[in-house]
UniProtKB/Swiss-Prot annotation:
Protein name per Swiss-Prot or TrEMBL: Super small secreted glycoprotein
GO cellular component: extracellular region
InterPro entries: GPC_filovir-type_extra_dom
This protein's encoding gene: GP
Keywords linked to the UniProt accession: Disulfide bond, Glycoprotein, Secreted, Signal
Pfam assignment, any one: Filo_glycop
Top-level taxonomic group: Viruses
Disulfide bond positions: 108-135, 121-147
Record carries keyword Signal: yes
Residues carrying sugar: 40, 204, 228, 238, 257, 268
Leader sequence residues: 1-32
Cellular localization per UniProt: Secreted
Similarity remark: Belongs to the filoviruses glycoprotein family.
Length: 298
């Protein structure tokens, strides 16, 4: 049996921070790039042929595929909200499509879920499928669930983006971002459109911050995964946990972790200690993503 307590935290540690980013994208007037989005891997050869017949596209060499992350649309990225967008189904074969370039993701996910009998809920990644290579935060969820289905699909028809491959299903222990695959139509075939060399693969998922890329893994425990009664715990260590709430940003969880360590709030017994954050604590440190406008409470 675990022990639950109310965790009182210094409020001045969690002041609201906000920042704005103005992005100005300049295109030459003659540089027209129509954008098409592939939903559910439904782009067929016939669709490409129709585009070829129009004046914008004279050759399939003008097509360049890109992965676009859903978080850019402002979807909720906290673990309780994100996992509600995924569900298990049987009888539907998975589909995989490749893409040439992708965005950097603020939030990625990595699932290790087992059934109550100990068997795996998710399939292992096929050869050639590696984790999404650029994630600021990796939300790693371990736990159990009924997993009523052969594969976990996206309920809204999006893809799970891996390293230059997008799949309709989630693979066990493989980091992914939610997104869609789009294609750019270039005015003319340009071999140097993606001229930069591929970014080198991350080492153990985290590199020196001075390299311009830094990833942090945040760990959770889940029970009843995939059901309406799913419960999530933020893992401080293997005996100390915090009840997870949708309002907790990644930045808040990292400072919460530090506070629990420095204030001696970790479990000092062999039993599990579960904290609950005081509802009056302001948890709005940081942002879910720099482009998302946070809704103010009425």
């Amino acid at each position: 049996m675990g022990v639950t307590g109310i965790l009182q935290l210094p409020r001045d540690r969690f002041k609201r921070t906000s920042f704005f980013l103005w992005v100005i994208i300049l295109f030459q007037r003659t540089f027209s790039i129509p954008l098409g989005v592939i939903h559910n891997s439904t782009l067929q050869v016939s669709d490409v042929d129709k585009l070829v017949c129009r004046d914008k596209l004279s050759s399939t060499n003008q097509l360049r595929s890109v992965g676009l992350n859903l978080e850019g649309n402002g979807v909720a990225t906290d673990v309780p909200s994100a996992t509600k967008r995924w569900g298990f189904r049987s009888g539907v074969p998975p589909k995989v499509v490749n893409y040439e370039a992708g965005e950097w993701a603020e939030n990625c996910y990595n699932l290790e879920i087992k059934k109550p009998d100990g068997s795996e809920c998710l399939p292992a990644a096929p050869d050639g499928i590696r984790g999404f290579p650029r994630c600021r935060y990796v939300h790693k969820v371990s736990g159990t669930g009924p997993c009523a289905g052969d594969f976990a699909f996206h309920k809204e028809g999006a893809f799970f983006l891996y390293d230059r491959l997008a799949s309709t299903v989630i693979y066990r222990g493989t980091t992914f971002a939610e997104g869609v695959v789009a294609f750019l139509i270039l005015p003319q075939a340009k071999k140097d459109f993606f001229s930069s060399h591929p970014l080198r693969e991350p080492v153990n998922a985290t590199e020196d911050p001075s390299s311009g890329y830094y990833s942090t893994t945040i760990r959770y425990q889940a029970t009843g995964f995939g059901t309406n009664e799913t419960e999530y715990l933020f893992e401080v260590d293997n005996l100390t946990y915090v009840q997870l709430e949708s309002r907790f940003t990644p930045q808040f969880l990292l400072q919460l972790n530090e506070t629990i360590y420095t204030s001696g709030k970790r479990s000092n017994t062999t039993g599990k200690l579960i904290w609950k954050v005081n509802p009056e604590i302001d948890t709005t440190i940081g942002e879910w993503a720099f482009w998302e406008t946070k809704k103010k409470p009425h």
